Amino acid sequence: EYEDKYGEVPTDRDERLEYIMSKAKDRSRTFSPVKKEMERIRKIKWKTLKYTVYLVPKASPRPRRSMNGHFYVNGAADNKRFFKNFYKETLDVPIIDTPCKFYCDSYLPTPNDMSLVNQFLAEIGLIRPIKKPDFDNLAKTYSDMTQGVLLFDDALIIEGISRKWYSAKPRIEITFKYMEEFDSDYNKKRISKAVRHNL
């Protein structure tokens, strides 16, 4: 199925661009708006929102199956409520509804059985956690908790980094970098439609 749909598309990027432009009836007329849009998109400014939540980082529990066959995540509603209150009380920002980048730094408690030398090295980031929770589960947990509260939809996240650290002061540091405007009319229409659908 993949081969039928995408087999003729080149693997090399320059060849793919040539392939896309080969569909144009008048290449010069098509390329002019492409150049204009490229310049506009490159000039889009990004805003940064950074905040710290003083909790021990935990991944969401795996979904469990109830007796009636439905799936649920134990404690998910409490987590969502906590974060909703946290954002209302701490952050005075409009909901993010443009493409964004998400960075999650999870500081796990430094183990008590570490030597003082290792505790010091862990605090400055030279010794890192290689235990549960997994880095991707932490990122998913904390990006999900922003959905509908700080972030219109986590589908807006176009790039993300999740890192695990040790610290004597456990916490979660979240950074969002988001566009001041949309990168394209195409994406703007998609989000506008989703917003109208949720009203």
Protein language model features and the residues they cover:
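Acidic, proline/glycine-enriched N-terminal capping motif
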Residues: E1-L199
